[in-house]
Design a protein with these regions (language model features):
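Class I SAM-dependent methyltransferase SAM/SAH-binding core
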Residues: 65-69, 73-122
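Short alpha-helix
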Residues: 189-205
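Conserved Class I S-adenosyl-L-methionine
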Residues: 210-276
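N-terminal, positively charged/glycine-rich alpha-helical extensions of SAM-dependent methyltransferases
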Residues: 1-35
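A short glycine-rich, Lys/Arg-flanked "PGG" loop and its adjoining helix->strand segment in the class I
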Residues: 147-162
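Conserved alpha-helix/loop element of class I SAM-dependent methyltransferases that forms part
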Residues: 44-62
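A short acidic, Gly/Pro-enriched loop at the edge of an enzyme's catalytic core
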Residues: 122-133
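Short, glycine-/aromatic-enriched active-site segment of Class I SAM-dependent methyltransferases
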Residues: 168-188
């Protein structure tokens, strides 16, 4: 079973355009350092330690190719390329995110990293069996058709290729209309129930390797991000505007509370496409 909120099919532009337009400024980098302990260019709940654990499930190495869906400004994608030696292609629906990612790749001198604008809610412009691995961190919940998305990723994976995604909006307790509205203010969200992702993975012919509840990371990251932003309230209100700043702070407070109370949870899924 799935539930949707907000009729827009992608996150609202103003929030994301402002974010990506200022992503590499010292102010926003400092907020990420304060929130996560170090700045890997993350835009969701991901920590460096968590990404390292995820990488251990993907078998990436030089000569392999990764597709990172909803890559944002590219920091975590480039970190994967640097740590594993694989080539990476990051895609995102926001041109400002891809511009930021391309700039960062040039600064870091990573020749095996590419970024392009693409809408992951639709069929992707790549041939069958192109990638050894596909990742999508804290963004699949913005795509309206879970079966279409996972079928498309299955098509793109090579035999024995691996898929890893996190779903940060799994409904694991009662939610009010007001709580959902605050938690999903930034555009379209698809809320799922326990077992839904596993079922769709199976229907798409993928073998689930790992399913893990990682809600605690979201609860901790939300609290730290809210506090880090509050420490720079004056600057952020000037850049973002009063209402967007307050909406983001309310979002982080709600995300943290619902995660802490285990009512809206975050899970990671790793799966494999059968070999020939």
């Amino acid at each position: 079973m799935t539930h949707t909120s907000n009729p827009d099919l992608r996150p609202r532009g103003d929030h994301y355009e402002t974010n990506y337009g200022n992503f590499h400024t010292e102010l926003y980098a400092g907020i990420r350092r304060d929130a996560f302990g170090n700045d890997i260019g993350q835009n969701g709940w991901l920590t460096a330690d968590e990404q390292d654990r995820f990488l251990s499930w993907l078998n990436l190495c030089p000569g392999k190719r990764l597709l990172d869906v909803a890559c944002g400004a590219g920091g975590p994608t480039l970190r994967i390329a640097s740590k594993t030696g694989c080539s990476v292609l990051g895609i995102d629906a926001h041109a400002s995110a891809i511009s930021a990612a391309t700039m960062l790749a040039a600064e870091e001198g990573l020749a095996g990293a590419e970024f392009q604008v693409a809408d992951a809610a639709r069929s992707l412009p790549f041939p069958d069996v192109t990638f050894d691995a596909i990742t999508c961190i804290d963004a699949i919940n913005h795509l309206p058709d879970r079966r279409l998305v996972l079928s498309e990723w299955t098509r793109l994976l090579k035999p024995s290729g691996r898929l890893l995604f996190t779903d940060p909006t799994v409904v694991t307790g009662p939610l009010t209309k007001e709580e959902i509205a605050t938690r999903t203010y930034a555009g379209f969200y698809l809320l799922t129930t326990p077992g839904h992702n596993e079922r769709v993975l199976r229907e798409c012919g993928l073998r689930t390797l790992t399913t893990e509840d990682i809600t605690h990371t979201m609860a901790e990251s939300a609290a730290r991000r809210k506090a880090a932003r509050a420490a720079h309230e004056s600057e952020l209100r000037t850049i973002e505007g009063d209402r967007p700043y307050e909406a983001q702070q309310n979002f982080l407070a709600m995300a943290g509370r619902l995660a802490q109370e285990r009512r809206l949870s975050r899970f990671v899924f790793a799966a494999e496409k059968p070999g020939d």
